[in-house]
Amino acid sequence: MLRRLSVGLLASAIALAPLPTKAQDGTAEDLGDVMSISLKDVVKPTIGFQGAIQGAGTPNQAGIGGFFPLSVDDNSVWFLDALVNAHFGDRDGYSSIINTDVAGGFSTSTRLGYRWLNGDRSWMYGLNAGYDTRPINTGGTDTGINVSGTEKSAFFQQVAVNAEAVSNEWNFNAYALIPVGDTEQQLNWYYQGGALDTYGLDVGYFITPVVNASVGYYYQNGDLGAADGSGVLGRLAYEMTSGVTAGVNISYDEAFETRVSADLKVRFGGASTTAQRKEVQQLPVINALTSTPSNRDVRVHDAGGASVLAINDGRVPLIDGASTL
């Protein structure tokens, strides 16, 4: 059922994209500007850094990343996008995975994708897929349960697929994050951590060419079962100057409740001249060709109780709240 849901969400981004007629119309001047752009002049490698504060199942992090065109044609591009992030400890008393504090780690993410423009360049469509990893170091808990001396590291991984459609007014993004390998691991004597399957659809509107507001729906599911259910999210992003984008996010689901996070992305390179970079910044449909794909984190949650105590380094099962031997 979940796999069918993910396929449906991915198809919806392409199916819904042609609906907004206002973005299709455009003025003759707008169409002339976009048709005159040579993609080989503006679709160039970019590299830089990014950072984010913790959200629903995602860590405090900062790192480097880059977008690398593999092949650029008149109206399309094949690309590779890669990220490496260092993770930092959770805010005191505020676990990013619900109960256990994340003490650090790092992550990697790669996406291979294809993006193309329609005939009059009023829409950009894209498909990408990739692989993400997330080793985790753990600390204490926010629940008062003493786990000192039993903290463990864990390693989670996932495959991801994404479909996108962008005009100069609207953007649609559908995605599926699917954990693979050992998706459920012990974090300490009491809590287990699990990577979440996540399937979502975001719909955004460009208030201006550099300000985008979006809302989204997601469904999450994990082997532990404690975080299963639906959620909603909102995002406001502002490209302050070419290559520098800041965003604020708010999400809600029953497991993580309300989470507010923020992120910053800086990229250097891109279009050949300053004038071209400014022109591209005012045309979201062209700017999207070199944008970094979203939804790159392996989302993790935890759960505890008598049902998980048997995995206790060979010790006897413990009652809820008991300390280790």
Stretches found by the model and what they are:
Residues 50-53, 88-100, 140-151, 184-193, ...:
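Extracellular loop and loop/strand-boundary signature of outer-membrane beta-barrel proteins
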Residues 58-64, 102-108, 123, 155-159, ...:
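Residues that define the transmembrane beta-barrel architecture of outer-membrane proteins
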Residues 24-35, 185-195, 200, 205, ...:
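Flexible, glycine-rich linker and terminal segments associated
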Residues 51-57, 70, 84-90, 116, ...:
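Transmembrane beta-strands of outer-membrane beta-barrel pores
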Residues 21-81, 85-94, 307-323:
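Short glycine/proline- and aromatic-enriched beta-strand/turn motifs that initiate or cap beta-hairpins
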Residues 148-224:
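Detector for outer-membrane/organellar transmembrane beta-barrel domains
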Residues 64-68, 110-114, 161-167, 201-205, ...:
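Residues on the lipid-exposed face of transmembrane beta-strands in outer-membrane beta-barrel proteins
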Residues 73-80, 119-127, 169-174, 209-215, ...:
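Repeated loop/turn-to-beta-strand initiation elements of outer-membrane beta-barrel proteins
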